[in-house]
Amino acid sequence: MHKLFAVRSLSSAIVKSFKSLQNQQAAFSTSLLLDDTQKQFKESVAKFAQENIAPYAEKIDRTNSFPKEINLWKLMGDFNLHGITAPEEYGGLNLGYLYHCIALEEISRASGAVAVSYGVQSNVCINQLVRNGTPDQKQKYLPKLISGDHIGALAMSEPNAGSDVVSMKCRADRVDGGYVLNGNKMWCTNGPVANTLIVYAKTDTTAGSKGITAFIIEKEMPGFSTAQKLDKLGMRGSDTCELVFENCFVPNENVLGQEGKGVYVLMSGLDLERLVLAAGPVGIMQACMDIVIPYVRQREQFGRPIGEFQLIQGKLADMYTALQSSRSYVYAVAKDCDNGKIDPKDCSGTILLAAERATQVALQAIQCLGGNGYINEYPTGRLLRDAKMYEIAAGTSEIRRLVIGRELFKHQ
């Protein structure tokens, strides 16, 4: 009983520390990275996320579901978070990728699961429509997605086509007035709850990468269905499933981009997807620091706080430099993208660095908490499970290394 009380007392101290965000942020200065307006935006999103998302993070993970008592999608829409890169005429903020990274970082700090679903909605779906949609498509789909009334998703991977996306088997056969889709898509984030999905299928099975087309799918389309929700290791509550297409008719006006140009739509968006999602592991690393710093101040061994020991201070230093270097890289590349300089190797580099560092920082957070880090009274285990996803999703760490190496070799 005494040990349980001690655990809960320390856990309570950590919860209280979340309420002093300004003090925490002072220890992680962004003065060299952000201007005053960007800092105010970061503080505003941090306050929103800690008040409206963080209190549900443990329950979301435990139940593998968003809370029923609050509509987080609509709440984020009311706070103008979904359309950060979208034009104002559709309800967006038109602020750019740096602001988008800042928002995703702070949401991830509150809940990794909510952040990855938010990233798919705001970047992978909405931003792809902004970049590639026709005026009619934008007018039809963007306002409801940006407001949070509708949820978006994207599907390219299949049970037997992951990194080798060009080997996809999902087909789109031409018919009068449109196409008929048949096949399956796998690991679709937001799939079970999405109203609007961007889906890639082969319109010409003999043309290789030039035979793939992107389509806008609506959940009500006959022949489209979702399979059972997947039970994941981490990012639990971020609904993920398999998509099934059985003679699903898609009209011509729902082609995104042009027929045969799906790989261009995919790859041009993938660079920006990797950049924005790289802010997710940055937020997870910050969440680790939010837990560890108050813990090592409260936890005593040998008559003094364990944070006074050099071994612990060394761990804190390693965690801090991993966080700040990753954050600086993400912000710098986001600024370049806002200036029209989209570099595949740096977009891949941001998420390669941040994802692998986040896994290591989460492991160190568990180590700093010792036995408490290994029990579910503390969120460190959840943070580790969530962090690992970023080494796999949006292209694995191995694929990111290939992209970087190929770009470096090509330019030489």
Curated annotation (Swiss-Prot):
Cellular component per GO, a single term: mitochondrion
Family affiliation: Belongs to the acyl-CoA dehydrogenase family.
Record-listed E.C. numbers: 1.3.8.5
UniProt-recorded name of the protein: 2-methylacyl-CoA dehydrogenase, mitochondrial
Expressing tissues: Expressed in flowers.
MF terms in GO: 3-methylbutanoyl-CoA dehydrogenase activity; flavin adenine dinucleotide binding; short-chain 2-methyl fatty acyl-CoA dehydrogenase activity
Location relative to the cell: Mitochondrion
Residues holding substrate: S163, S209, K210, Y264, D271, L272, E273, R274, A394, G395
Binding site for FAD: 154-163, 187-189, 299, 310, 367-371, 396-398
Pfam families for the chain: Acyl-CoA_dh_1 (PF00441), Acyl-CoA_dh_M (PF02770), Acyl-CoA_dh_N (PF02771)
Domain of life per record: Eukaryota
Keywords noted in UniProt: FAD, Flavoprotein, Mitochondrion, Oxidoreductase, Transit peptide
Transmembrane segments: none
Note: Due to a high homology with IVD, this protein was initially thought to be a second copy of the isovaleryl-CoA dehydrogenase, but based on 3D-structure modeling and mutagenesis of the human isovaleryl-CoA dehydrogenase, Val-116, Val-120, Val-124, Met-389 and Ala-393 were shown to provide the substrate specificity for 2-methylbutanoyl-CoA.
PANTHER family per UniProt: 2-METHYLACYL-COA DEHYDROGENASE, MITOCHONDRIAL, ACYL-COA DEHYDROGENASE
InterPro entries recorded: Acyl-CoA_DH_CS, Acyl-CoA_Oxase/DH_mid-dom, Acyl-CoA_Oxase/DH_mid-dom_sf, AcylCo_DH-like_C, AcylCo_DH/oxidase_C, AcylCoA_DH/ox_N, AcylCoA_DH/ox_N_sf, AcylCoA_DH/oxidase_NM_dom_sf
Main localization, broad class: mitochondrion
GO biological process, one term: L-leucine catabolic process
PROSITE patterns: ACYL_COA_DH_1, ACYL_COA_DH_2
Targeting signal (transit peptide) range: 1-25
Disulfide bond residue pairs: none
Subunit structure, as described in the record: Homotetramer.
Cofactor(s) it depends on: FAD
Organism: Solanum tuberosum (Potato)
Reaction(s) catalysed (UniProt annotation): 2-methylbutanoyl-CoA + oxidized [electron-transfer flavoprotein] + H(+) = (2E)-2-methylbut-2-enoyl-CoA + reduced [electron-transfer flavoprotein]
Function recorded in the entry: Short/branched-chain acyl-CoA dehydrogenase (SBCAD). Uses 2-methylbutanoyl-CoA as substrate. Minor activity with the straight-chain substrates, butanoyl-CoA, valeryl-CoA, hexanoyl-CoA, and octanoyl-CoA but no activity with isovaleryl-CoA.
Active site (catalytic residues): E273
